[in-house]
Amino acid sequence: MLSSVPHRKTWNKSKKTVKVTRSYPTFPSLNAWEEFRGLFPVDGEPNPGVGLGVEEGLLGQMVHSPEFNLFPESVVFESNFVQVRKGRDWIDIYKTYNTMALGVTSSVPCLPLPNILLMASVKWHHGQNQTWNKPSTAPKIILKRILPLKFVELQVSDHLQRVLRLRTVTEKIYYLKLHPDHPKTVFHFWIRLIQILQKGLSITTKDPRILVTHCLVPKNSCSPSGDSQLVQKKPQASQPSESLMQLMAKGESEALCQIFVDLHQHNLFSSRSSKKTENKKDSSGKKTSPSEDSIPCTRDLSWRDSFTYGEWERENPSGPQSLSLLSTLAASTGPQLAPLIGSSI
């Protein structure tokens, strides 16, 4: 008797095992300095900062962890250093498995430059390979310092030995030697960071996502001999606009500056029309007051020679600006831009 149930085919024999090999994109050679100029991370591609150990390292993972949850939307630019003692040979203070993680970040992600310094001590297990991003065994890391960058002095102490000099507001001085596992490119990043923290960013930004409407770092007015001189001249029509830029840099409102400009032009017109009246007052023996056209809309602007803070200290940045330290440094860094040894912020 035939069964009404249809015969089921067995699919086990028809199954085939296919071995899929994934091709991962390879990192470019990181030895040449020119290869990092203009390099931006693209979605879907590995971040070159991770391979260098300057992004998503131990310090960044710690401050972004649920335990701390500090600056969760900001990128941390970091490197590992060895604390040394000042001398001819730069002797290590601690043992080889004790390092210091030094990093900078931004308290608000819309700021184009960092304003926070992070310091942490890292104690590696004996014989452990000191990989920065994902070590096999988590080392012991302790956050030591969280300081505003404007209260920290950072210098290049020894360019050949890759040593930085860091002085805190409490006059505590650290000599930090970049870990030998970091390539030379990483130290150039720190040199460039010191330079832009000292002089600020140029109005020409390499990142099109950063909207900079005007330059906030004024030019130093120096004589051909090199000595700065304060020259008093009769104010011209171009001076109110220059004063306006300085007032904007000091944080005053744009509308208030425009009022000063209009007031200065009105006083200039009224002083010319009342010139005959002032001459009559001079003949009557009364003391004359200085004419209004000799009073500019602002006072002496000689303070701008010492105006060195950057755009990140503004209360209201011009639009949302993403903080990608590695992209900014790599795009705007060149060997010719490296500062002299001993330049400080």
Swiss-Prot record:
Annotated GO CC locations: Golgi apparatus
Subcellular location: Golgi apparatus
Chain residue ranges for the region called Disordered: 222-241, 271-299
Keywords: Golgi apparatus
Ranges of Basic and acidic residues composition bias in the record: 275-285
UniProt GO BP: acrosome assembly; acrosome reaction
Major localization listed first in the record, in broad terms: Golgi
InterPro entries the UniProt entry points to: GARIL-like_Rab2B-bd
General function of this protein: RAB2B effector protein required for accurate acrosome formation and normal male fertility. In complex with RAB2A/RAB2B, seems to suppress excessive vesicle trafficking during acrosome formation.
Family: Belongs to the GARIN family.
Protein name: Golgi-associated RAB2 interactor protein 1B
Protein encoded by which gene: GARIN1B
